Amino acid sequence: KIIFFGNGGSASDAQHLATELIVRYKKKRKAIPAISLTTDTSALTAIGNDFGFKYIFSRQLEALGNKGDLCLAITTSGNSQNLIEAAKLSKKMGINFHAFSGNNGGKLKRYTKNLILIPSKTTSQIQVIEIFLGQILCNYLETFASK
């Protein structure tokens, strides 16, 4: 299963990519297990209220993630504490943590060896490249992993 998440525009990208895998990217095929942790407003607001905003992804990951899953954090800065908490928990749970990030990877680069770095500090440029990379990922998975 692939678990996507991010904040703001990156949250939208996470939802978009998970949907491409569940429904279809280009062709009719078996669904690829994927989820975005940015869609459940009840969970997001309850976790934010009861535990703190920095745990909105790690708490869901604790409930929904399994050893061998793949997480993809999407970020323009690499400095969001909620992504860092998810990276830390992923390691403890045996979940493969990957990230797309601009801004030199920010603090998040300390917590993953699987960082695709977009060499820009301009949010709009970073977001365009991140969704492009996500589309490449969807195409690859649909072509090779859904057989």
Protein language model features and the residues they cover:
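Glycine-rich phosphate-binding loops that contact phosphosugars or nucleotide phosphates
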Residues: 4-5, 10-147
